[in-house]
Amino acid sequence: DPIIEQARSALSAHYRDELGETFRTVGMCLYRGGQDSVAWHGDRFGRGATHDTMVAIVSIGAPRALLLRPRNGGPSIRHVVGHGDLLVMGGSCQRTWDHCVPKTSASGPRISMQFRTRGVR
């Protein structure tokens, strides 16, 4: 899709100095409503298990909360991600923090586009 490719190219250009590489893949999640959710996890597969990485998330649609908490315990931090927002998880975030999108009583559809570099899942 040309719009997704434009977003990938723009994000790659913006973060190239920090990343040292381009974003290679984009994954998409459709949240049909408030009952669709993602459990606590960290993207620690591939290089993300041992290296600092970056995931750039573009949100389209209804606002949803994204929670972050330290992997070894501690209070969570709540971010509401709205239509057109960009959330970047970089550095050691994937190895040292978990994140989730909890269920909610009121929410419309949302698409989350996650841009990743080579070997990050």
Language model segments and positions:
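Non-heme Fe(II) oxygenase metal-center motifs and adjacent flexible, charged/small-residue loops
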Residues: 1-121
